[in-house]
UniProtKB/Swiss-Prot annotation:
Keywords attached to this entry: 4Fe-4S, ATP-binding, DNA-binding, Helicase, Hydrolase, Iron, Iron-sulfur, Isomerase, Metal-binding, Nucleotide-binding
SMART domains: DEXDc, DEXDc2, HELICc2
Protein name in the entry: ATP-dependent DNA helicase DinG
Catalytic activity: Couples ATP hydrolysis with the unwinding of duplex DNA at the replication fork by translocating in the 5'-3' direction. This creates two antiparallel DNA single strands (ssDNA). The leading ssDNA polymer is the template for DNA polymerase III holoenzyme which synthesizes a continuous strand; ATP + H2O = ADP + phosphate + H(+)
Organism listed in the record: Salmonella paratyphi A (strain ATCC 9150 / SARB42)
Family indicated by similarity: Belongs to the helicase family. DinG subfamily. Type 1 sub-subfamily.
EC number(s) reported in the record: 5.6.2.3
Annotated [4Fe-4S] cluster binding sites: 120, 194, 199, 205
Positions that bind ATP: 54-61
Reported function: DNA-dependent ATPase and 5'-3' DNA helicase. Unwinds D-loops, R-loops, forked DNA and G-quadruplex DNA.
Named cofactor requirement(s): [4Fe-4S] cluster
Length: 714
């Protein structure tokens, strides 16, 4: 489709009308360029897909929504906007699209949040009920569906009143009533515990109401995991050829795709025996009380017992083999080099893949049959069996995927990382098996790049070390296929708005010097805090261990610090805003997740402290396997893997400071390797251009760690 004059005029008119809706709107050349690039790509005028880096301040969300909606209407397609986190998804759904509706009055949009974000009305009814009989009936379905106390029951009753009165849409983030994680775990549900169409509450269930709205919507706001699953199953979203797809926070896409290729499951022999026995009894119950019209051959008791016995014997053999690789009777881990399993283990995995897939098929067959019996049997007993069969199906689905992945030598031309772990829980040993594909380009090519005609991949950060090469390698996007890669200029003047401070540290932040380095960092931070020049501060760490050591050094000012984990992130940010706006000092302290999606403008954040260059952990089985593979190809893991990842993290961390033209401040990085190592200049070159200062650090006396006493040999 060509971009007609009428279509261009429509996009221009909406953009002009938008300026009247936003106070202090500043027209920006990068934004106009992005609108044009997105329009040309989605209309098929230029290239296959577009990866476009839009720095903070460009206004990327509206830059893809305006042309996306216009072209979707012209082509009678659905615009799907996908994000990596709930916060951005909710911002687009609750803020950006309602704003556009003011200039596009008939705009129809909805959101497809994950099931776990919605309340389950069945669970809510049980927890809100003050009638013991009602609670007993629902507890028959699930033992946890009773309130812990009267206050919790009253809170649930208020939530139910809001839901029934259409004052609440059922999303956790859309109610002012406080819901702690434990309560929400019981209020929500997952696929395995959902009765689906068999549920009495199906028609008014917020999750299914939202799913039905997708069919009528022009714009659907989803998340990457849902989009990947939808492309795999061809469910939830319209057909790929009828989509226009925007992947915001697109740098997360390879990780999300990798998660779909990541399987972990318990394989402890005794636990497995229990699951197989429970499933056999469940099948017997179905045959006795809810006999299907056509009996699956495997439902025959003798055949099923023989099948389960073979599964158990294979699992027991695998446990015995894995125990040879790990120290006896203690927590341990064993990784298989390059993901290569011994022949005997590979044969077991291949056989288990077939056997567990057969059990998955049997569970699915019974579940489909049970779903058709709701009008002819005791509804409570039937629902209980449906729930149990649903959970069995989920377990065998996971096991089937695990053994199928374990049986693969490679995925997307790279090894599959494989390892086993042994944990001790309540005095009992538990064995787990894990598999992760380290490359996912073939999966993305099959599900996205070859299925959806035109896709926009965007983020404030897509490059590392000033290059798209890492994104290309991880995602499979390539110029040879007609994909375009564009990096927009920042609208901000970083030279005037901020500076980069690299204190003259005596120690490098290596593991051997961690104690001394953190003591120096704490001393400089304390000096900055006491100067009272900055009311809003952010401190970012590469590890939880380092963060805790830092907190020990500044324990006397702990009340000023809002630390990740103390409360949900949104509450910490809310409290930070209130403190700064009332003239108080406030310091947010967190890990890498606080370096993304945190938008604090002006006085809310004028100083960012970064503990060190955040290289990926060297003890991760996935990272180690990837390193082995790269070396086998005569590629240098530090250049291909570690340095690009560190550059990406540093760009995101530094990007927290300048969020608008009104922002002023400084970024403090406590890592002298930026100035002393050859790679340091490359990392600096990938950052916005700030003037650099190197102040002295206060003298610190650090007590050396006591070395453990050597045992005298006897």
């Amino acid at each position: 489709m060509a971009l007609t004059a009428a279509l261009k005029a429509q996009i221009a008119a909406w953009y002009k009308a938008l300026q009247d809706q936003i106070p202090d709107f500043i027209p920006r050349a990068p934004q106009r360029q992005m609108i044009a690039d997105v329009a040309r790509t989605l209309a098929g005028e230029e290239g296959r897909h577009l990866a476009i880096e839009a720095p903070t301040g460009v206004g990327k969300t509206l830059s893809y929504l305006i042309p996306g909606i216009a072209i979707a209407r012209e082509e009678q397609k659905t615009l799907v906007v996908s994000t990596a986190n709930v916060a951005l998804q909710d911002q687009i759904f609750s803020k950006d699209l309602p704003l556009l509706r003011k200039i596009i009055p008939d705009l129809r949009f909805t959101a497809a949040f994950g099931r776990g974000r919605y309340v389950c009305p069945r669970n809510l009814a049980a927890l809100a009920s003050s009638e013991p009989t009602q609670q007993d009936l629902l507890a028959f379905l699930d033992d946890e569906l009773t309130p812990n106390n009267q206050e919790e029951q009253k809170r649930c009753a208020r939530l139910k009143g809001d839901l029934d009165g259409y004052k609440w849409d059922g999303l956790r983030d859309h109610t002012d009533i406080a819901i702690d994680d434990d309560l929400w775990r019981r209020l929500s549900t997952d696929k395995a515990s959902c009765l689906n169409r068999n549920c009495h509450y199906y028609r008014e269930c917020p999750f299914f109401v939202a799913r039905r709205e997708i069919q009528e919507a022009e714009v659907v706001v989803a998340n990457h995991a849902l989009v990947m699953a939808a492309m795999e199953s061809e469910a939830v979203l319209p057909e790929p050829k009828h989509l226009l797809l925007v992947l915001d926070e697109g740098h997360h896409l390879p990780d999300v795709a990798r998660d779909a290729l990541e399987m972990s499951a318990e394989i402890t022999a005794s636990w497995y025996r229990l699951q197989l026995d429970l499933f056999s009894k469940l099948v017997a119950t179905c045959m006795e009380q809810f006999r299907p019209k056509t009996t699956p051959p495997l439902a025959n008791p003798e055949r099923l017992n023989a099948h389960c016995e073979e599964v158990y014997e294979l699992i027991a053999s695998l446990n015995a083999i894995l125990n040879l690789y790990m120290p006896a009777a203690q927590e341990a881990e064993h990784r298989f080099a390059m993901g290569e399993l011994p022949d005997e283990v590979m044969e077991i995995c291949q056989r288990l893949a077939k056997l567990t897939e057969t059990l998955r098929g049997l569970a699915e067959s019974f579940l489909n049959d049970l779903s058709e019996k709701t009008g002819s049997h005791d509804i409570m007993r039937l629902h209980r069996v449906i729930l149990q069969m649903n959970r069995a199906l989920g377990m065998f689905e996971a096991q089937s995927k695990l053994w199928r992945l374990a049986s693969m030598a490679q995925s997307s031309g790279a090894p599959v990382s494989k390892w086993a772990t042994r944990e001790i829980r309540e005095g009992q040993l538990h064995v787990w098996f894990h598999c992760v594909g380290i490359r996912v380009s073939e999966q993305l090519e099959r599900l996205l790049w070859c299925s959806v005609p035109h896709i926009i991949v965007t983020s404030a950060t897509l490059r590392s070390l000033n290059s798209f090469s890492r994104l290309q390698e991880m995602s499979g996007l390539k110029e040879k296929a007609g994909d375009r890669f564009v990096a927009l200029d920042s609208p901000f003047n970083h030279v005037e708005q901020g500076k980069l401070v690299i204190p003259q540290m005596r120690y490098e932040p290596t593991i051997d010097n961690e104690e001394q380095h953190i003591a120096e960092m704490a001393a400089y931070f304390r000096e900055q805090l006491e100067s009272k020049k900055h009311h809003g501060m952010l401190v970012l760490f590469a590890s939880g261990r380092a963060m805790q050591r830092f907190l020990e050094h500044v324990a006397d000012v702990r009340l000023l610090l809002l630390v990740q984990g103390d409360q949900p992130r949104y509450r910490l940010v809310e409290l930070h805003r209130k403190r700064v706006e009332s003239g108080e000092r406030s310091v947010l302290v967190g890990l890498q997740s606080f370096a993304e999606g945190l938008d604090l403008k002006g006085e809310l954040l004028t100083q960012v402290h970064i503990h060190k260059i955040a290289f990926p952990p060297i003890d991760s089985p996935v990272v180690i396997t990837e390193g082995e593979w790269l070396k086998s190809l005569n590629r240098y893991p530090f250049e291909v893997q570690s340095l690009p990842s560190a550059s990406f993290n540093l760009i995101q961390q530094v990007g927290r400071l300048i969020r608008s033209h009104a922002c002023r401040g400084e970024v403090v990085i406590y890592d002298k390797r930026l100035l002393t190592k050859n790679y340091g200049q490359r990392l600096l070159n990938a950052l916005p251009v700030f003037p650099i200062e190197q102040p002295a650090v206060p003298d610190v006396i650090v007590k050396p760690k006591a070395k453990p006493a050597r045992r005298r040999r006897r």
